Amino acid sequence: MSKTTVIQIGNTDDKLSQAMWARFFERVDSAIKSNATQIFFSGASYPTAEWQNAAWVFEIDEDASLRLYDEIKYLRQRFNQDSIAWTEGKTILINQK
């Protein structure tokens, strides 16, 4: 069974230099792309915004979700982040039926 997941990262405390933020973003992006069955959205804050943030919305299978969760935990520690937001839930399609 798959579920919809949202991951959000940020650098609002300026712990990461621009180069490190770019590496962190790339590693999270790569981890999601290699585990998600479908990515619905990915985006980041405007380049001139005061704070750097990024978010992904995607569908993922249960087994892959467990692997990704462990990888995201590792990346949080590796890049000295206090937290990474992970939200998951069931998607309900509203249609004419």
Residue ranges of model-derived segments:
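Secreted/extracellular ectodomain signature
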Residues: 22, 41, 95-97
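Extended, folded cores of ATP/NTP-driven motor/assembly subunits in large transport
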Residues: 8, 17, 54-57, 83-85, ...
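Short S/T/G/P-rich N-terminal loop/turn motif that feeds into the first structured element of a domain
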Residues: 1-24
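Short, flexible N-terminal segments of the mature chain
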Residues: 18-38
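Short, conserved charged micro-motifs
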Residues: 15-19, 62-70
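Short, intrinsically disordered low-complexity segments
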Residues: 33-66
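Conserved short beta-strand edge segments in small beta-sheet-based binding/regulatory domains
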Residues: 37, 77-96
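Short amphipathic alpha-helices in soluble, non-transmembrane regions
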Residues: 24-27, 66-79
